[in-house]
Amino acid sequence: MFDFLNEKDRQPPALPEGTVRRRYSIEGQVQGEGFRYRARYAAQSLGLTGWVENEDDGSVTLEVQGDPALFLKLFALIQRSDYIQITSLRQRDLAPDPWERDFRVRGCW
């Protein structure tokens, strides 16, 4: 009756071949400039999933999942703003999340 309650018991959905999940720590002029919302729009337009969040130290963390060939396009779309300036980018590969279905902005009302 309430199958969603037993979701942990279900098999995870299959991911497209080549799916990668990557976490980026981004520094520069990235807070207060619309970075998170630009990232969400760009990720959604490219069919990527994940999340983006401001950090207390002024950096932004972006976790993205999908075709890694699209990750460079994602950053190109984000940087089309005159206000956003990325000065440092660190990345770390993670295990893909088969349950994730969208891209979210974290830490907002």
What are these regions (language model features)?
Residues 1-109:
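Intrinsically disordered, low-complexity, mixed-charge
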